[in-house]
Structures are given as C-alpha cells and as structure tokens.
C-alpha cells in the first residue's frame, strides 16, 4: 500500500521555506503587474515603486492585524493619496503579492515536469482552444456524457490546509489565513448557486481553488489510469486483478468511510474521459449509463467524505451524447450522426448501404452572443444594429479601429466554429453598428457613409485567417466559401473574451 500511496502524493517533498519575506520585495509586485493585472486601480494613477515598497507593505500588514484596519491617519493619506480612494486597496496589494509567492513552488514543479517530459512549447497547453482538439478526437467515439457543476462553497480553512502540503512557512500561512477570514466577503461575489471571485482579485483565489480541485483530481486520475489493468480477461493475470481490487479497498478504508468501498468494484472501463473548465467538469464514457452512475456516485462520495463539500447526486444528469449539447467556453458542442447512402453492386443484385458516422461539431450560440452585444450597446435585443455613443473628440479612424479590433477578436476566438453563419451575423452587426455610429457623429445618413467608405471598408472586417487564406488560395476564395467551414483552433488564446463569457453574467 505504501508503494501505491505515492500516486496520491503530488510531489510534496519540494516544499519551500521562508516565503514570508518575499512579501516585502518590490519585484514580486512588478511580476504581478506584468501578469495582466494592470486593469487594477493600483496601477492607474501613481507610480508602481511608490505603492509597493517594503515600507508600504509593512504598514498594510500591520493595519490588517489591527482591530480596525480601515482607519488611516491623515499623514498616510497625504503621503499615499491612493489610500483614501479605496478602502480595500491594500487588500488587493497583498492578494497580488500572495498570488505570485504561492505560485513559486508550483511553477518550479511545472518547469521541471515539462523538462523531464521534453515538452518544448508548454505555452500551447495553456490555451483555451487546446481542449477542443481533444474533444474532437475522443468524443466522437463516446456515447454518454454528464455535465457536472463542481461544488464551489469551499471552507477557508480547507484552502489553507491545501497549501500546508506545499509551504512550511508558518508566518505565510498564518497571514494568509487571517487575510482570507478578514476579506472573504469583499473578495467574492455570491451569485445564484455558485460563488464567483470578484474581478478585482481573481488570481489568488483562482489559484487556491485550482490547487484544491487538483487534490481530488489526482485521486480521480489515479483510479482511472489503474483501471486499465482490468481490461484483459486472461486467466494469467486474474490474480493481479484480484490483488488490485484488494488495494483499492484498502485505500478506501484508509482515506474514506467504510461505505465507500462498496462502489469501487466498477472500474472496468478504460474509456472514461474527464474535462474540467471554469467551475464545471464533463464526464464522458463509451459504456452504459450504469457505469456513468457509478462514476457519479464515486465523485459525490469523494467530495463529501474527503473534501467536506456537500453535493446532491440528483443534480448530476446523464445524457446520450448524440442528443445533448454542451455549452462551455463560448461554444455549443455536440456529437451529430452524419448518414450517407452507398450503392453496392454485386452481379445482378444491388444493395443500398446506409453508413452513419459520428462527428463532433462546435457552433457559436447566436442568442447568448446577441444578448452580450445588446448589453454592450452594439445592437438591440432582436439583433438589429444600433449606433453606439462616442466621445466628441474621437476621430473616425479611432472608432473604426475599435470596431475592427472587437470584430477580429471575436472572429479569432470563434474560429473553431463548424458553421460560420452565426459568425457572419456578428460581423454584420458590428460593421453596421460602426457605420451608424459614424453617421450619428457627423449627423448624416447611413447610406451616405456607405458610399463614402466604399467597398474597402467592408474588406477591413475580414478576419486574419480569411485574409491569409485568400492570399494562398485566391481562386478558391473567390469562388467558394467551403474553405472556411472547417474549425480553426488557435493555441495563443489564454482568456475568454468578455462578450462570450455568458456563464458569469
């Protein structure tokens, strides 16, 4: 058992001491700034070195430990004017520092793992689009799918306990525990049945949440990988299979309640696939619904007995993949049956053979996307383009560039769509909204501006891939649109476009 318990240990031997002093290093906050946190109010007004010096951070930590930390003296307001504008400003500073510091052990482990596996382009693995080629390759051969909402209400102490396996610095853990208890309500946003991290402080809490989820996923992947030993029915390894069952049951007695071992006998199918995205996960299998039900109860029991997260099994639905659509990451994905009839001739007899092939399709859900465009004042709720109010000092080129940038970003993100009709409609809305905005600014009609801009204006709304492909295949581009009906996945997309992030709205 000691040999197999190593599978459940996430290489915790490389624990790092003395992370607490890093909070007082200026370059830590510079790293946080370079990682895309420049949207924060921390970096809008004052210089960076004035706000993240060791003296300022010491004062912030001292006041956080005080009984009333929101009281600032007049001298501090004069020396640091940004203190008076936002009461939670220093909590953002410390959370950004924490986010960079706690990522250090994980980053070192990731780099060593990639070097050991000789993975050169590791940045491609971070792309959101990298999940779709996997789905195209696997899901077309599967039958049943379950879309699971991962329990989100995690106790603060469990998040801290997760980091204790990685960090032995008691001062850092104590400060982190105090910080979470003090500012939890101001740093998260409850919404419906889940809890969303506020947009101002996502990095630290997303890291803590992901590290917590990886704890149960490590056990989940172990059981899935070890189930491959059960595929063979040869009598020569029958005793090995029995021995493996004994090891699984012993693991259940050590880590879980005794009732848990009765549902561990089902791991006979190696075609179970697991995908996690945002706060949800997908389970898909080639086997029967009975196997899916057993995996479902395994997950629920794992969450309840080991991670203390209550979850109701009835909330996990199991559906046939050919009759169900998955909405995630701005796409609607499904597996469709494409039938084709082939005539076969044998001597004087002819036969009609009906072939059915499964195909994984990804389309752009136009209704939610129009809703997002409507909230951004590009169109009304019915999808009719409207003019967008602009500043009086905005030039025509600035307005056009802004619309072109939005159009190309959406086209770039939705380039993997199997059907381009919805994408063409989005381009039409943005193009006509741009013309109406210019006409409104100059107090002229839309027709007048169309004549003034000419056909070159319409060509500017072509996406990057369309321009490149039209240069490579000019004849095909001019005669047929079939060239662009296939999905094109990009491995440089690391964040979801705000206009397509419907699930958080």
From Swiss-Prot:
<keyword id="KW-0934">Plastid</keyword>
<dbReference type="GO" id="GO:0008380">
    <property type="term" value="P:RNA splicing"/>
</dbReference>
<dbReference type="GO" id="GO:0009507">
    <property type="term" value="C:chloroplast"/>
</dbReference>
<dbReference type="GO" id="GO:0006397">
    <property type="term" value="P:mRNA processing"/>
</dbReference>
<dbReference type="Pfam" id="PF01348">
    <property type="entry name" value="Intron_maturas2"/>
</dbReference>
<dbReference type="InterPro" id="IPR024937">
    <property type="entry name" value="Domain_X"/>
</dbReference>
<dbReference type="GO" id="GO:0008033">
    <property type="term" value="P:tRNA processing"/>
</dbReference>
<dbReference type="Pfam" id="PF01824">
    <property type="entry name" value="MatK_N"/>
</dbReference>
<comment type="function">
    <text>Usually encoded in the trnK tRNA gene intron. Probably assists in splicing its own and other chloroplast group II introns.</text>
</comment>
<keyword id="KW-0694">RNA-binding</keyword>
<dbReference type="GO" id="GO:0003723">
    <property type="term" value="F:RNA binding"/>
</dbReference>
<keyword id="KW-0150">Chloroplast</keyword>
<keyword id="KW-0819">tRNA processing</keyword>
<keyword id="KW-0507">mRNA processing</keyword>
<dbReference type="InterPro" id="IPR024942">
    <property type="entry name" value="Maturase_MatK_N"/>
</dbReference>
<comment type="similarity">
    <text>Belongs to the intron maturase 2 family. MatK subfamily.</text>
</comment>
<protein>
    <recommendedName>
        <fullName>Maturase K</fullName>
    </recommendedName>
</protein>
<dbReference type="InterPro" id="IPR002866">
    <property type="entry name" value="Maturase_MatK"/>
</dbReference>
């Amino acid at each position: 058992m000691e040999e197999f318990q190593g599978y459940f240990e996430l290489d915790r031997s490389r624990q790092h001491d003395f992370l607490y002093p890093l909070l007082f290093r200026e370059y830590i906050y510079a790293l946080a700034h370079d990682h895309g946190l420049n949207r924060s109010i921390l970096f809008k007004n004052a210089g960076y070195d004035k706000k993240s010096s060791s003296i300022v951070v010491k004062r912030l930590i001292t006041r956080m430990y005080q009984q009333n930390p929101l009281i600032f003296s007049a001298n501090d307001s004069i020396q640091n004017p940004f203190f008076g504008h936002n009461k939670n400003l220093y909590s953002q500073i410390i959370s950004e520092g924490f986010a960079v510091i706690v990522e250090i052990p994980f980053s070192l482990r990731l780099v060593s793992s990639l070097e050991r596996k000789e993975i050169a382009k590791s940045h491609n693995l971070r792309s959101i689009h990298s999940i779709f080629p996997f789905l195209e390759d696997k899901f077309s051969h599967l039958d049943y799918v379950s879309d699971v909402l991962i329990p989100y209400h995690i106790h603060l102490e469990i998040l801290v306990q997760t980091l204790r396996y990685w960090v032995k610095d008691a001062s850092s853990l104590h400060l982190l525990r105090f910080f979470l208890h003090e500012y939890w309500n101001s740093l998260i946003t409850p919404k419906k049945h889940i809890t969303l991290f506020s947009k101002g402080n996502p990095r630290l809490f997303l890291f803590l949440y992901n590290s917590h989820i990886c704890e149960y996923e490590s056990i989940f992947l172990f059981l899935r990988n070890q189930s491959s030993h059960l595929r063979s029915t040869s009598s020569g390894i029958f005793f090995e299979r029995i021995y493996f069952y004994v090891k699984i049951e012993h693991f259940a007695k050590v880590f879980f309640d005794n009732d848990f071992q009765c549902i561990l006998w089902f791991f006979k199918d190696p075609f179970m696939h697991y995908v996690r995205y945002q706060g949800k996960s997908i389970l898909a299998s080639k086997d029967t619904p009975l196997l899916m039900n057993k995996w479902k109860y395994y997950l629920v029991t794992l969450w309840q007995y080991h991670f203390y997260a209550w979850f109701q099994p009835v909330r996990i639905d199991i559906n046939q993949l050919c009759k169900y659509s998955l909405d995630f990451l701005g796409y609607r994905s499904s597996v469709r049956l494409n039938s084709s009839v082939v005539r076969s001739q044998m001597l004087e007899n002819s036969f009609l053979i009906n072939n059915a092939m499964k195909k994984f399709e990804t389309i752009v859900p136009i209704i939610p996307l129009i809703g997002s465009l409507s909230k951004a004042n590009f169109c009304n709720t019915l999808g009719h383009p409207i003019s967008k109010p602009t500043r009086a000092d905005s030039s025509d080129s600035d307005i056009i560039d802004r619309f072109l940038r939005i159009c190309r970003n959406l086209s770039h993100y939705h380039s993997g769509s199997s059907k381009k009709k919805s994408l063409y409609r989005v381009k039409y809305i943005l193009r006509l909204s741009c013309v109406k905005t210019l006409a409104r600014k100059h107090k002229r009609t839309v027709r007048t501006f169309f004549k003034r801009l000419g056909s070159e204006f319409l060509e500017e709304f072509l996406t990057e891939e369309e321009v490149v492909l039209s240069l490579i295949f000019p004849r095909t581009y001019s005669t047929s649109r079939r060239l662009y009906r296939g999905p094109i996945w990009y491995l440089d997309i690391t964040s979801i476009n705000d206009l397509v992030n419907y699930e958080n709205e």
